[in-house]
C-alpha cells in the first residue's frame, strides 16, 4: 500500500483532505458537555399528602407505590423518603444504557395500578413521574432591588410567570420552587365558629358550593326549535376572585333572618400556598427555582436555553425585579473544556519542538505535524459516527492520542532519513526501502495499542461509559494514525525530504544541533556497549527485574482507590440542621450567621450566598436549611488556600462553633448527576424488620464508631432528620359513635384545623390558584388548643374534642427513608485529608459488620459506581494483557517472542504507581485509563526493538546478540524521540491548575511517570528479555510453533 501512494501523492492528499472535511463538519454538529451520560438514568415519583406525618405518608402512599414497582426492566435500585410535610419522593435508578423514556413509561404504567389504592387527598393533588437527576443543574434567584415587593410577592410572580415556562424548556427534568404562589387563605377562629354552632366541615362545604364554576349551557342551544333566531351562552355562578367575595360566602341563616358569613368566623387574605420555605440572596428577600436536568439531556444546551427563556421574560418584569444566578454548574463545564483544548494545543506545540530537536529539519518535522490535524479531525468524525459528544473524556483521549499519533509518522520519517544517511539513497527510493522495514512494526504497534483499549469499550455501568469514551477516541486516533503513516506520510517523505549524503549523521552540523548530534552519537555508542555488557550477565538483571515486579505489586496494593478526583467547580453547598423541634425562626438565625461568614470572612473568594430555610437534601422541615455558595472566577482566587476544598474545610471548622446547630460545607461530586456531595453514600438497611427505633440505635452506634477514626473519616453524618417530639391524638371511636359524632367529620375537622385543607380553586389575575382552610396561627400553637375545636353530633349538639379524644407526647421521625423496599437510613461522609474514598468505604464496611444481626448495608449513588469500577479494574487489566499477547503471537507467528514484549509492562506500571504515590493521587478511573495507556506504550517501545532484531536474524542471518545490538542502536533515537514527545505532550495535564485540574492531573501524572520508567528501563531490559526468551525457546525446542517465519512485509 505505501508504494502505491509514494507514486500517487495527490491521491494521498485527497484522502487526507476528505478525512479533515468530515472531521470539520462533525465538530460543528457535535454537542459539547462536561461528561457524557455517565450517571445511570433515574425516574422520580413525587406525591403529596397535605397534613400527613411521615409515618402516615410512608404507610399509605410510599409502600403502596413501591409494592407495585415490580417487574420493571433494568431496575438497579430504588430509594424513597417520606417526610412530615406530607411529601413523598421515590427514585428508581436504572442500569446505564437504559432508555430513560421507556423506563419512565414503565414506571408510569405501574403507578397507574397503585393510584386507586392511594388516599383521595393524594389523588386530588396529583402524582408526578419525572426523569431527572437528583442534583440541581442550576439555581435561578429572583430579587427585588427597590424594596417595592415582599418575599411573598416575588415568590408569587416566579410561580405564576416563570416556573411553568422554565419547566417546559427542553432538557429540564424537574423544577423546585423556593417559595410559593399566592393562595386564598381562610384562617378560622374556633371560638367564633363555636359561638355560631358551626364547624370546619360547614366552612368547607359552603366554600365548595359557593366558589364553583357552573356550566349553565346556552339559549337556543342545539337542537333548536324551528325558527329560533337567538343563540347565546348562559353564564351563571363563576369562581370567586377576591377576599371580599370570599368574605361574603354564606355559612348559615338563623331563624330570625340574621346571617353568618365566612368573614364573621375567619380572617381571609391572599397568602402563601405554604410557608415552609424562606429564601434569601446575600441576606435580602428572594425567591428562586432549583432546576434539575432531565436524564440524558445536555447540561450546556439546557442552561443556555433557560437563560435565553429568562432573557425573553425580563423586559416584562415589574419594576425592581432582577434575576441572579447564585448556583450554576455550567461555567465549570465550559472552562474545563476550554482548559483541555488549551492543553491539547500546548501538547501539539511541545511535540513539534521535540520532533524538531531530533530531526533538525523543518521539512522533516512538518511531515509528522501534518499528521496531527488529519488524525484529530478524523477522530472527531468517528466520535460523531458513534453518537459521542465533545467532552472532558474525549478531549483527554485526544491529548493522550497526540503523543501516540505522531509516533507512527516520526518512526517513518526518522527511518527514511536513517536509510538515506546510511545508504545514500534518494528520498523516493529510501522511502520505499524504509516502509518495507517498518511497515510490520507500525501495524504491530497499532494492533497492540488497539488491543489494550478495545476491551474497555465492553464494560458496563458508569465506569464502562467513561472507559468507552477513552477507548473509542484513542483506538480511532490510533487506527487513523497508522493509515496516515501508511498513506500520507510516505508520500510526503518522497516529495518533501531533501537527499542526505551517505554517512552524514549530522555530526558535522554547527551550533546547538551539531553539539546535540555529537553527544547523542557518543551516548548511543555508550548505550550499545552497556547493552552488550548486560547481555553477557543477564541473570543479575533478571533478579533486578523481579525486585521491580515485587515493588510494583506492593505499590499497587498500597495505592488507595477512589472513583473520580474531586474538582473545584466554582460552587458548593452548606447544609444546616438544628435539633429536633427547632423552629423556622431559629434556623433563620443560623442561616444568617452562615451568610455573614461567607460574605465577610471569605469575601475574597465568595461571590454570593443563596440561603434557603426549610429545604435540604436531608429532608424538609423547620429545622433544616441549605446555602448555595457561588465562588469568584478561578483566576481571581489562585493558590491552594483559595480552592473549594480549603474554603469548605475552613467554613466547617468555623461553623463547629455555632451552638445548637450542625453545619457542614461540602463540595459537589465530580459528576453532579451521581449525588449531591463528595465522599461516600452509605445506606444502613433494616433487613429483619427490627423497627425504626432499633435502626436508629444501630445508626447512632455506627456514627459513634466512625467518630473514633478522625484519621480516616470526616463529616460522617446522617442524611436525614432526627426524631422529633410528636403530639399524638387518640380518637376513642366507641365514645365518638355513642355521642353521635361522625368519624369522617372528626378527621375533616382535625385535618382542616391543624394540617390545612385544600378546598378548591379561585381565579387571581387570570390564573387559577388554590383555596386553603386552616386554623388561625394563635389557635394551634399549644397542646391545649385542641380543646377549642368542636364537632357537630347527629342531634345538632356541639361536642368538644376532649369528649372523645386523649393526647400524649411521643417521638417519631419527620423523615422516613426506604431502600429497595426496606426501611433504611442514609449516611454521608468523607475521607479524612490524605485518605481516599476507597479506604474510607472499607473502614465503614468493617464498622457496619459489627452492628446487630438484621442490620445490613449497601452503597448507593457515586459509591455504588466506585465499588463497581473497583471490581471491574482487575478484569480490565487481565483482558487487555491477554488480548495484547494474542495479537503479538499472531503478529510474530510465535508463542514465545510476545513474552519478550509483555515482560516490559511492569517497567511502565511501576513508574505510573510511583508518580501517583508521590503526588498523593489515587487508583481512580482516570489512573486506570492512564495505566492501560502506559501498558500500550511500554509494549510499543519493546516492539520497535524486537521487530528489528527479529528481522535482522531472519532476513540477514545475523546472530542473536549481534542482531539485538544492531536493533537497539538503530531504534534508540526513534524510541527516545517518540517517548519524549509523548512525555512532553502530557506535561500540560500534569502541571494543570484551575478548573478541571483534578481530572487532568489524574490522567497525566500516571501516564507520564509510566512513560519515563518504561523508556529509561525498557531500553536496557528489552534486549535482555529478547535474548533470554529466544535462547530459552530456541527453534529446536519450539515444537508447537511453525517452522517457518512469516514475512510481514
From Swiss-Prot:
The gene is acrB. Belongs to the resistance-nodulation-cell division (RND) (TC 2.A.6) family. GO terms for biological process: alkane transport; bile acid and bile salt transport; enterobactin transport; fatty acid transport; response to antibiotic; response to toxic substance; response to xenobiotic stimulus; xenobiotic detoxification by transmembrane export across the cell outer membrane. The chain crosses the membrane at residues 10-28, 337-356, 366-385, 392-413, 439-457, 466-490, 539-555, 872-888, 899-918, 925-943, 973-992, 999-1018. The keyword Cell membrane applies. AcrA-AcrB-AcrZ-TolC is a drug efflux protein complex with broad substrate specificity that uses the proton motive force to export substrates. Disulfide bonds: none annotated. It is a multi-pass membrane protein. It comes from Escherichia coli (strain K12). This is Multidrug efflux pump subunit AcrB. One of its GO terms (cellular component) is membrane. Pfam families: ACR_tran. Disruption phenotype: Loss of susceptibility to contact-dependent growth inhibition (CDI); inhibiting cells still contact the target.
